[in-house]
């Protein structure tokens, strides 16, 4: 268990009875949302959290998917903290338009975004990032593109450890195993010693955008369900550019503060879909470093640092080595050469999602449609047109040769299991047909624009915790 030690104190019998009177919450999944929610609720409920395994390890074979490097890069994780064991949380808000598409009223949600920012950065650090944001918008804003504000903290946090540091309190029981089914009053968990029933007044499904819909479907007896509505942010390196020595794009691409990097994303909307463009440091105009499996080797090796194969790949991509040094030494981006990285918006469609089959692993279809590709291509051309005077030279891959990778934001797959009330009321989180069950992870998001979903999910965690305290 995690929390205050069991000692006899002046509270004595009263303290024991208070604990016995608490309602029981079972949280499935100890990743981003599950870790936060379990700590926020620990003093009001008797909290149990279910995590697949004790050992931190990536998951590569729990889902069938042949595209987008879904099963060759780390984007699902086992162990307390989930994928936060591997990834920095790049912090970016959904804009008002995207919040409304996601069923979230923007003004009422603003205080929860503020709480989410404060979980990761102190107020002085946030003020410094805000000054960089304003400078970026003054420098490169005002044209066709809107300027997205992304903050990448220097410190990578395991969410389980961070949440427990921020919100200590009563004990949390940890159960290791696979949640098999949610039923009225309990959760079935299969562990080393067989199937265990965990009594629950309330259940929070926070197993992640690929696992939560599978759990919900199987709990409802839908063993062959298709969980539609999946969307992510297809990402691809598509070009290299040489900028003018005095180009305003240089500072906006990366501003270094004492505790973070602030990166301005240039966002275009074409045919109803957004595309965001980020510039990353390069050495020259050769395209070899942004094609093939070595193009993301920096993040792949960071999460698997002892792989001989990946070490050799890194040594073959000096641009990745240089970028790592710039990040660690807080020098920002340097030089005239940059790679162009895009992330595209996907919207929920009926043919994209997770297919369940009895006795088999779930399979994911997340392909980029022809319409999406055409939209991204037009947005890239708009970027090159708008900033033509900043670019001395460019080499671009044709859109037919763009190789997309999944950005691991796995969203939208629980939409058929939850209502759409138009705001974050309890019904927004409540799983239909499973009394006392709530959903809080990427599977809940109906839209995400071009924003990494992590900050929004943390804000939703704070919102759900506020609502559940009234149920204690």
Enumerate the predicted regions with their spans:
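C-terminal catalytic lobe of FAD-dependent flavoproteins
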Residues: 296-385
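Conserved redox-cofactor binding core of oxidoreductases
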Residues: 104-184, 401-403
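Redox-cofactor-proximal catalytic regions of oxidoreductases
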Residues: 60-126
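Glycine-rich loop(s) and the adjacent beta-strand/alpha-helix scaffold that form part
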Residues: 53-56, 73, 187-260, 441, ...
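Glycine-rich FAD pyrophosphate-binding loop
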Residues: 42-62
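A glycine-rich dinucleotide-binding beta-alpha-beta segment and adjacent secondary-structure elements
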Residues: 175-183, 339-341, 362-448, 454
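Mid-to-C-terminal "cap/lid" subdomains and adjacent gly/pro-rich loops that border
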Residues: 36-39, 206, 213, 217-333
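N-terminal Rossmann-like FAD-binding beta1-loop-alpha1 element of flavoenzymes
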Residues: 23-49
């Amino acid at each position: 268990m995690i929390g205050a030690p069991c000692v006899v104190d002046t509270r004595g019998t009263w303290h024991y009875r208070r604990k016995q009177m608490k309602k029981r919450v079972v949280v499935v999944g100890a990743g981003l949302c599950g870790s936060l929610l379990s700590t926020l609720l620990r003093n009001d409920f008797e909290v149990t959290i279910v995590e697949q395994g004790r050992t931190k390890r990536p998951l590569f074979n729990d889902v069938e998917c042949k595209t987008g490097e879904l099963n060759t890069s780390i984007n699902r994780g086992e162990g307390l903290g989930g994928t936060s064991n591997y990834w920095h949380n790049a912090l970016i808000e959904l804009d008002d338009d995207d919040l409304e598409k996601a069923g979230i009223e923007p003004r009422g949600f603003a205080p929860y975004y503020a709480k989410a920012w404060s979980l990761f950065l102190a107020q002085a650090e946030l003020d410094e990032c805000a000054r960089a944001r304003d400078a970026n918008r003054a420098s490169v804003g005002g044209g066709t593109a809107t300027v997205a504000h992304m903050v990448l903290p220097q410190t990578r946090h395991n969410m389980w450890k961070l949440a427990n540091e921020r919100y200590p309190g009563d004990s949390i029981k940890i159960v290791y195993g696979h949640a098999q089914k949610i039923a009225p009053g309990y959760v079935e968990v299969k562990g080393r010693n067989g199937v265990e029933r965990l009594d629950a007044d309330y259940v929070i499904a926070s197993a992640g955008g690929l696992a939560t819909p599978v759990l919900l479907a199987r709990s409802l007896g839908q063993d062959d369900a298709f969980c539609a509505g999946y969307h992510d942010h297809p990402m691809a390196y598509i070009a290299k550019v040489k900028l003018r020595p005095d180009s305003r794009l240089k500072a906006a691409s990366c501003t270094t503060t004492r505790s973070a990097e602030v990166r301005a994303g240039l966002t275009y909307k074409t045919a109803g879909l957004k595309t965001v463009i980020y510039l990353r440091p390069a050495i020259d105009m050769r395209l070899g470093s942004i094609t093939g499996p070595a193009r993301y080797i920096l993040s792949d090796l960071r999460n698997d640092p002892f792989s001989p194969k990946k070490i050799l790949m890194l040594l073959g991509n000096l641009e990745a080595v240089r970028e790592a040094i710039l990040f660690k030494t807080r020098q920002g981006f340097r030089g005239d050469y940059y790679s162009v990285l895009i992330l595209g918006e996907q919207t929920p469609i009926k043919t994209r999602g997770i297919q369940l089959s009895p006795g088999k692993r779930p399979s994911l279809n997340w392909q980029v449609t022809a319409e999406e590709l055409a939209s991204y291509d037009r947005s890239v051309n708009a970027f090159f047109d708008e900033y033509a005077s900043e670019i001395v030279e460019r080499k671009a891959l044709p859109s037919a040769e763009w190789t997309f990778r999944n950005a691991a934001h796995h969203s939208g797959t629980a939409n058929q299991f939850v209502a759409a009330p138009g705001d974050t009321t309890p019904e927004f989180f409540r799983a239909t047909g499973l009394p006392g069950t709530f959903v809080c992870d990427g599977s809940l998001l109906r839209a995400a624009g071009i924003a990494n979903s992590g900050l929004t999910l943390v804000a939703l965690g704070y919102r759900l915790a506020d609502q559940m305290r009234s149920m204690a």
